[in-house]
Amino acid sequence: MKAYWVSLYTKIENQENLKNYAQTVTPIIKKYGGIALVRGGKHITYEGEDFPRTVIWEFPSYEKAVECHESEEYKAGWNLAKKTTNRHMQIIEGQIMISKSSMQ
């Protein structure tokens, strides 16, 4: 079953650091089979905390998603942004429901 990294950014103090992080880790994430599904964009918050940026990556399996996040190369990339960026980040195993019949 596929898995997803869901990152909800609560604070971005330095856009350049975040850009460097993204440029560094994108090829690393892709090496583990990651595909970007959502990267920022216009949003409206109706309930709860506002997150100025949301990023969702899809992985071929939960194991690959965890392996990527725990890899030394990914951790080194995250070091580029973590001092000026706060986020909620989860790895979720599941599937995207793409039709009404699949949601029943």
Task: For the regions a language model picked out, list residue spans one by one.
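C-terminal structural segments of small proteins and small subunits
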Residues: 75-90
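Short S/T/G/P-rich N-terminal loop/turn motif that feeds into the first structured element of a domain
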Residues: 1-53, 60-70, 93-104
